């Protein structure tokens, strides 16, 4: 059996980019290392008193879990000390983070340290999501928020890590999507899903139907449609939703389906974060042959105006996303 580690695979991907300096390779390797640190604590969370709430709220106004803070700290410290990133942004921090030695970095990192952390106390899969951009300017010492507020189409790499029954890291550099499973016996991520291609249509839909009363008429009609009996179109679809975006997305990426987080009367602009969740997953989804929009516009074309900007999200198999969009737009 030919065992390919994530570090080796990242190095091999460099040949597709003749102009590559190797710096991005080091960045992705740093992210993989940080994921190992977070994974170590996630699997021990119930034993070392890092479950439950920390007693604070983040910039989103949400109660912060202890493990959120731990994961955030580990990622910042593990990645920010090497001088490869000039600026960073985290879902858990109000503003940008300027790491030590940033004057040598040429990239910006945006990340959600622990997506789905509300599930950690009940042992449901959680994950880390990340996104990498090249700096807009030539002077890393002057890196600013503008280097973070780039359209998703400017990403040079994106990925996520799922901490579940196994630990899986998925990433893209714009040349396909590849997945790696962590082998704890050797401490390495090994290639397990090469060149992931998501089905054009699926059989699952993922949405929080507990918010049905807050949905607009388009979303309600879509839900009625998706549940109707029609063998010709593969309906009804089955519901799969556990409230952990990265886990729901990963399942649909592999099996086919659509994840929908529409606007509601409570969150008229959507709830998910454009920079930390929607953009990186949209980049991955499109690279795997899928589609990602806010119901009307391509996610990767949205010009961000704030670090913690929110957005609706329709993401997954291309045909399924198009159908959901048509209901959102009132075409159906």
Curated annotation (Swiss-Prot):
Recorded family membership: Belongs to the FBPase class 1 family.
Pathway named in the protein's UniProt entry: Carbohydrate biosynthesis; Calvin cycle
Top-level taxonomy: Bacteria, Pseudomonadati, Chlorobiota, Chlorobiia, Chlorobiales
Keywords: Calvin cycle, Carbohydrate metabolism, Cytoplasm, Hydrolase, Magnesium, Metal-binding
Molecular function as annotated in GO: fructose 1,6-bisphosphate 1-phosphatase activity; magnesium ion binding
Name of the protein in its database record: Fructose-1,6-bisphosphatase class 1
Gene source species: Chlorobium limicola (strain DSM 245 / NBRC 103803 / 6330)
Subcellular location: Cytoplasm
Binding site for Mg(2+) 2: 112, 115, 277
Keyword ATP-binding attached: no
């Amino acid at each position: 059996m030919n065992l390919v580690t994530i570090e080796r695979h990242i190095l091999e991907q460099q040949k597709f980019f003749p102009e590559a300096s190797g710096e991005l390779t080091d960045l992705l390797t740093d992210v993989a290392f940080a994921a190992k640190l977070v994974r170590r604590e996630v699997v021990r969370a119930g034993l070392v008193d890092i479950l439950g709430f920390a007693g604070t709220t983040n910039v989103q106004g949400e109660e912060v879990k202890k493990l959120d803070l731990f994961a955030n700290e580990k990622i910042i410290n593990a990645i920010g000390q090497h001088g490869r990133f000039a600026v960073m942004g985290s879902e858990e921090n109000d503003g940008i983070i300027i790491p030590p030695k940033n004057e040598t970095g040429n990239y910006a990192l945006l990340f959600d340290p622990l997506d789905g952390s509300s599930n950690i106390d009940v042992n449901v899969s959680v994950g880390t999501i990340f996104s990498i951009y090249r700096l807009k300017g030539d002077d890393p010492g002057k890196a600013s928020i503008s280097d973070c507020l780039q359209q998703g189409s400017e990403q040079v790499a994106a990925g996520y890590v799922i901490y579940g029954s196994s630990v899986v890291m998925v990433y893209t550099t714009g040349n396909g999507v590849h997945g790696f499973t962590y082998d704890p016996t050797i401490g390495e991520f090994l290639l397990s899903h090469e060149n992931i291609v998501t089905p054009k249509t699926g059989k699952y839909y993922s949405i929080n139907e507990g918010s049905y009363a807050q949905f607009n008429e388009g979303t309600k009609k879509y839900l009625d449609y998706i549940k109707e009996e029609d063998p010709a179109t593969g309906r009804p679809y089955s519901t799969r939703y556990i409230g952990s975006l990265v886990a729901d997305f990963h399942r649909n990426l592999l099996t086919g389906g659509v994840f929908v987080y529409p606007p509601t009367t409570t969150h008229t602009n959507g709830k998910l974060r454009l920079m930390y969740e929607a953009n990186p997953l949209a980049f991955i989804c499109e690279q795997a042959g899928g589609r990602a929009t806010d119901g009307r516009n391509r996610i990767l074309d949205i010009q961000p105006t704030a670090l913690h900007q929110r957005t609706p999200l329709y993401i997954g198999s291309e045909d399924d996303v198009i159908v959901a969009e048509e209901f959102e737009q009132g075409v159906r």
